[in-house]
């Protein structure tokens, strides 16, 4: 008997198939999604001070650059304190902990804005959920690859 096709107003669901991927490729996907999260947040937050900026930084004692993402207000404070110290305006150099403590009010505002955007924007909430899935997947693959037997 012939099969009768009926048209359905229901949209076709999207199915994504992911095969085995290298750890490098998974890390690349995490970074791309992270960039998407920050771009969306930066476009929708209250001020440029709250923007999240990513770049490469080489830690003291190593030549290996690492990706570091931080809010603009923290980057600006670090630059200001470093300039003050180099010019002799202060005798104390600030540690990362000192900078974080001094920026507590700004971090509270940043967290509030992220939460507010997540609750008010389904798109942002979905981007964050995708990011969480990717980071969990990366962590699981990394743990499996480097597990001790």
Model-found features: residue ranges?
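Sec-dependent signal peptide cleavage junction
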Residues: 1-16
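Extracytoplasmic
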Residues: 12, 47-51, 64-66
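N-terminal secretion/transport leader regions
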Residues: 12-21, 69
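Primary mode marks residue(s) on the alpha4-beta5-alpha5 output face of response regulator receiver
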Residues: 21-32, 86-87, 91-149
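N-terminal post-signal-peptidase region of extra-cytosolic proteins
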Residues: 34-41, 51-57
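Short coil/loop "hinge" linkers that interrupt or connect long alpha-helical coiled-coils or helical hairpins
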Residues: 56-71
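Extracellular/mature segments of secreted proteins
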Residues: 61-65, 76-81
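Amphipathic, hydrophobic secondary-structure cores in small proteins
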Residues: 72-79, 90
């Amino acid at each position: 008997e012939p099969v009768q096709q009926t048209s359905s107003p229901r949209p076709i669901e999207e199915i994504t198939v992911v095969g085995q991927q290298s750890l490098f490729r998974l890390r690349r996907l995490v970074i791309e999604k992270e960039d998407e999260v920050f771009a969306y947040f930066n476009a929708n937050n209250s001020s440029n001070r709250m923007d999240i900026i990513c770049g490469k930084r080489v830690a003291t004692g190593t030549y290996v650059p690492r990706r570091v993402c931080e809010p603009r207000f923290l980057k600006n404070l670090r630059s200001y304190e470093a300039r003050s110290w180099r010019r002799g305006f202060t005798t104390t150099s600030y540690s990362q902990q000192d900078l974080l403590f001094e920026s507590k009010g700004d971090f509270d505002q940043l967290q509030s804005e992220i939460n507010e955007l997540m609750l008010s924007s389904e798109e942002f909430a979905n981007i964050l959920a995708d990011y969480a899935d990717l980071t969990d997947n990366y962590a699981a693959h990394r743990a499996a690859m480097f597990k001790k037997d």
